[in-house]
A protein has these predicted regions:
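Hydrophobic transmembrane alpha-helices and their immediate loop junctions
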Residues: 1-156
């Protein structure tokens, strides 16, 4: 029973991490598209379908090994490609670079607002509160982690 509990408790955070990383990467591609670069669009990477974004090592093997050995998740998705030469301005380049981080922060803020609204109305169950807290923590963690100023993170 303990093993099943651990696996079920790990599945929700894993799915949230995968979904949040995909939104993060699609945000980069969409920002590049808005700035004039169609690379991600032409390669079919402006999609929420997880298949084109999954890196077998970073999205499957490493997260599962990390969870079953350390009880935590670590992983990555394929970066959405863009051609910086197609971006019109330096501000456009900054917009593309920051789009993923801003997306993760937006997810966290919107989830926090919904959390507060449900709490005030008295309809927030402990299970829902824990799930929403997980969404907030995953996305804030991804945003902060991507601020690290070393390649391949967004902070570069």
């Amino acid at each position: 029973m303990l093993e099943a509990l651990t696996i079920s408790q790990g599945l929700f955070p894993f799915l949230i991490i995968i979904f949040s990383i995909i939104l993060h990467e699609v945000a980069h591609g969409y920002a590049a598209y808005v700035q004039g670069d169609q690379t991600a669009y032409r390669l079919g990477r402006l999609t929420l379908n997880p298949i084109p974004h999954i890196d077998i090592v970073g999205s499957v093997i490493v997260p599962f090994v990390a969870f079953f050995t350390a009880g935590t998740f670590f992983g990555w998705a394929k970066p959405v490609p863009y051609n910086p030469h197609n971006i019109r301005t330096k501000i456009g380049l900054a917009f593309v670079a920051s789009a993923g981080i801003l997306t993760n922060l937006l997810i966290a803020v919107v989830t926090g607002i919904v959390f507060k609204m449900l709490l005030v109305q008295g309809i927030l169950s402990p299970e829902l509160a824990k799930g929403m807290f997980t969404i907030i923590m995953v996305n804030v963690s991804l945003a902060l982690f991507n601020l690290i100023p070393i390649p391949p993170f967004d902070g570069m």
